[in-house]
C-alpha cells in the first residue's frame, strides 16, 4: 500500500508510524 503522509500508516502500526518514500514503517509494534 502506497502512503502519501504519516496519517496513511495509522491502520498499519500500533506505536510509531511514519511514511517514507511511499512506504509505511512501524516501530515498537
UniProtKB/Swiss-Prot annotation:
Subcellular location: Secreted
Main location: secreted
Post-translational changes noted in the entry: Contains 3 disulfide bonds.
Miscellaneous comment: This toxin is only found in male specimens.
Expressing tissues: Expressed by the venom gland.
Species in which this protein is naturally found: Centruroides limpidus
Record protein name field: Orphan peptide CllNtx
Molecular function GO terms recorded: toxin activity
Amino acid at each position: 500500500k502506497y502512503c502519501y503522509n504519516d496519517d496513511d500508516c495509522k491502520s498499519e502500526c500500533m506505536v510509531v508510524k511514519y511514511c517514507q518514500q511511499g512506504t509505511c514503517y512501524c516501530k515498537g509494534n
